[in-house]
Amino acid sequence: MGVQGFQEFLEKRCPGAVVPVDLLKLARTVSRQQQQQHLHRQLPPTAALAPGAPRAARGSVPLQPPLPPAALGAYSGGAGPTRHHHPAHHFHHHGQAQPGLHPPLPPPPPPQLPGARVLVDAGSALPRLYGGYQTDWVCGGQWNAMLGYLSALCQACAYPGGDGLELVVMFPGGLGKDRLAEWGRRCQAERQTAQLIVGHVGNKGTPPPRAWFLPPACLSHCVRLALIRFRVKVFQSLEDHHLEVVAFFRENGFHGLLAHDSEYALYNIPSYYSSHALKLSWNGKNLTTNQFLMQEVAKQLGLKRMNFPIFAALLGNHILPDEDLAAFHWSLLGPEHPLASLKVRAHQLVLPPCDVVIKAVSEYVSSIKDPSNLDVVGKDVFKQSQSRTEDKIERFKKAVEYYSVTTKLSSLPVGPSFLGFRNNRLGNPPLPRNQVGTISAGKPMFSHQVPQKVKYPPPFPVGPNSSLLFSSHALGESHAFSEDPMLQNSPFANWAVSYDSSASQFPNYLPSKASPPLGPDSSHSSSSDGDEPNGASSDHITEAFHHQPEWGNPNRDRGSWAQPVDTGVSEASLGDGEPHIPSLLSMSTRNHMDITIPPLPPVAPEVLRVAEHRHRRGLMYPYIYHVLTKGEIKIPVCIEDECNMELPPAALLFRSARQYVYGVLFSLAETQRKMERLAMRRRLPVEVPSVILKEWSAYKGKSPQTPELVSALTFREWTCPNLKKLWLGKAVEDKNRRMRAFLACMKSDTPSMLNPANVPTHLLLMCCVLRYMVQWPGGRILHRHELDTFLAQAVSTQLYEPDRLQELKIEKLDARGIQLAALFMSGVDTALFANDACGQPVPWEHCCPWIYFDGKLFQSKLIKAGRERVSLVELCDGQADLATKVEKMRQSILEGVNMNHPPPSALLPSPTFVPPMVPSLYPVSLYSRAMGSMPLPPQGRSRGFAGLHPIPPQGGKLEIAGMVVGQWAGSRSSRGRGSFGMQVVSVGGPGKGHGKEQTGRGSKGHKKGNKQGSSDGVSKSLELHQGRSRSQVNGNSGALIKEEKSDHRLPAPSQCALSRDSNECNNGNRYLPMNNREKNHLQEQKLETVAQRKED
């Protein structure tokens, strides 16, 4: 969009408007000025505090109470003493002086006020908050290095003399449906960048260029957790992120905004700093960046700052896209412009360069005689438009209104204020934290966008007492939401709900058509070059997938696409005899194809209050509030090779976990139980309505312009309690249910996962993610050495030495390792989502990735394990005790896992890539198998094409009418193992051409009970254990598990982790004892000897 290129234009073409500044020096200067102003404004204590005397004279400024204990003085590592100034103690001390008895006391020293407060937009400043654009981000993230950078940044801002810089960070927490087209274009660009990254690493083995920076998976939430650890105030937006950032900035008197988004420059922010140029010196004494002088920008462009809204509307934005303004932009250039020949090249829609458009539009806006008459301006802009002229003019007026809302109103209508910050003057501190009242939201500009007033409770304590919010505790003693001191003392009962619970039967149901805050017409923006067929031929897309009464019936069609309504052709063209074909510059553009979902089940008002409360304060995963209120989420893009069919996309890999989380959030299990009881009473069939949600994502074969419909799932093993009890329950059973719900969502509900002797407490979340990845039904994701690498780097002492890891040199990066790291961090992202949805059974201190993962360390150990084939002890830096921990964790991860599922067949659609808009239904422990009996995939990477499986390594024979006419041997690496049968292909006769398998020949064969023929049997030891799936460690092969021959019966379900009957691990899935292992080893040697003799 033209708006997004405005900041780059300022940096390159307006050198006088971009000046370097030192934020720490500015903070100290502002602090001294505030203290001097405080001394001049202060009244005599006797006049101010005499009984019955007024607080201040008319026209004077009342004394502002100082801040509570400083937020930036209690970091880990220490950055200065904590300052305590209590207002009540201050007044009481000076109230003791009585005139006439003693001479008046000297004036007290001025309180130490904060130097300056800067608001940081985390949505555009994530690369700098991560620590910069160093090349190690491609390995999956160096989280301890990021933690060290944020610690140094916070310590530098916390100046010990009271002249520090207070940082307040706001993360994007809104769904942003009105910017969906912009998000889709960004996803397509990130997909292309990911392919460039994978290709570069695969070909050269070196880190990609800095310009290809793609944020590591889960970066936003890792930064949020790190800032919470350092006691930095963190918030999340609720709807429109840009408007809420500007409203929060103006309401609380911040001295500057640190971001990298052109829209903030056009919002007329007083002090706008670039986060892209933010640099922290090595000694922590200088924090430099660039400041944009918008007054100088307006002078160089020949504009008045009051005309910035019209200028922003005509550049192209999310309301009025570039494609709708293409004809206007080309008309400004004129036919004699050197670039005019590009307008009709190959009959395609070509847009002028951004810098050329900015100059031309600025000249046009400066020549407007009456900028207030938007109707005249709109008609002049779209005078060459051949379709939808009125619609474009209306959206032009809405765009002007959108960008002028920040300059017209001092209190923006974007909802209530945050955490006790009130409207105050620039530079003044906020009100004390114990004086928080209701805040008026101002006059609404868009009525359907503005929520009602909400009375917020006192904010959480910041500083030494902030541990009350996230206290360190054991897993079994985790606090529920209701046990939070912030929530206990808050008047939740007096809250005014921001939604009308009596307006509908489903209070949290928001139709997708009304989601954009600027009305339904704002969604007619352009789309990117997606994978959708016929993507540029329709004008307006109406709502599709109308609500069906039998939505839950999988045999029925879930809806049909509505025919596009061509409302763009004018009435004059319809009246002509011949059809009118508009030009490409005036044709309407397609935004996205939304789908209407059935109404969501109702959610308890207490749950929604807690969800909104924690969402605004950055204490909860943002997906949760979106799911409860809108029933849809957006999934970011991560690094994945679209040409590699071995690894699934992250959006599909962790979809099953998200489906279970949806079931937990909407209390689907309790609903089903109530419906079953009601059906039994009335003797009617059970009809449980399905809960359908929308997931917006982009991966191979999936365009971001269309959502996927996903249904919520329930646990089969037990009935999860409702969300209110899961979040607000205080009993010990409720805590156990929270933990069990989290483990069930991650398919890790086994006893050994909660045994600290097997899985350390701080590594529980990591082991749950790895166990989930091991159980992927579409094929094997992790080999054994890769699983050991994840575990070995988690227990390594080098994990907490970022300086040493920074000096670590990796000769050639492993492309598969980069994708595995991205998948793992996407799993951590999903685990954080599940943990917050289940009531946070895992404390936030144990969720942070810097305690169990480092991408660069993982790469170095993966190269040792994969290429150099080192032993497990060498992989653990020569420490046998660490190798023992890795073995125990591996056993816990593989406990009860059935690895006998075959890879997807080439003749059948792969279960890995589900077609769009089809919900992926994967049960808990039962996965659908491909038709026929297929052997396990070969160990290691196959050299064949994806989907084509090599000849079975056990060999086989060809039978015609029951007679063996041909026979072939298998590979020497797997010949004679006896674990899998020989492949038999029968043509004619009883087999009817179907393939079958026969077991290999052992030392003592026996006849199999089969009428068609006989085959070699297995040994008695294998016969004794037939049908059991054992998780046995394979010594030197690359396979993750070596399984014995089974009769394909389902394994016995493993005992749950929190069973009342027993707290011990289930012995039914333990490893084989040593005598059985020795017997199996001898038997394998005998089988191999017999097979070699037979071949000779």
Swiss-Prot record:
| SUPFAM superfamilies the record matches | PIN domain-like (SSF88723)
Low complexity compositional bias, start-end: 35-59
The residue ranges flagged as biased composition, category Basic residues, are 82-95
Q: Which PANTHER family match?
A: CONSTITUTIVE COACTIVATOR OF PEROXISOME PROLIFERATOR-ACTIVATED RECEPTOR GAMMA, CONSTITUTIVE COACTIVATOR OF PPAR-GAMMA-LIKE PROTEIN 2
Q: Where in the body, by tissue, does this protein show up?
A: Expressed at low levels in a number of tissues.
* One MF term in the entry's GO annotations: RNA binding
Q: What residue spans carry the Pro residues bias annotation?
A: 101-113
Glycyl lysine isopeptide (Lys-Gly) (interchain with G-Cter in SUMO2) cross-link, renumbered residues:
1042
Modification type Omega-N-methylarginine: residues: 58, 977
Q: Which GO terms describe its cellular component?
A: nucleus
Q: Which family does it belong to?
A: Belongs to the constitutive coactivator of PPAR-gamma family.
Fetch the InterPro entries from UniProt.
Coact_PPARg (IPR026784), PIN-like_dom_sf (IPR029060)
Return the Basic and acidic residues bias intervals.
Answer: 540-559, 1041-1050, 1076-1096
- Identification of the protein by name: Constitutive coactivator of PPAR-gamma-like protein 2
User: Is-annotated flag, keyword Ubl conjugation?
Assistant: yes
Species of provenance: Homo sapiens (Human)
Keyword terms: Isopeptide bond, Methylation, Ubl conjugation
Q: Gene name, please? A: FAM120C
Q: Where is this region: Disordered?
A: 35-113, 508-579, 971-1096
Q: Which residues form a coiled coil?
A: none
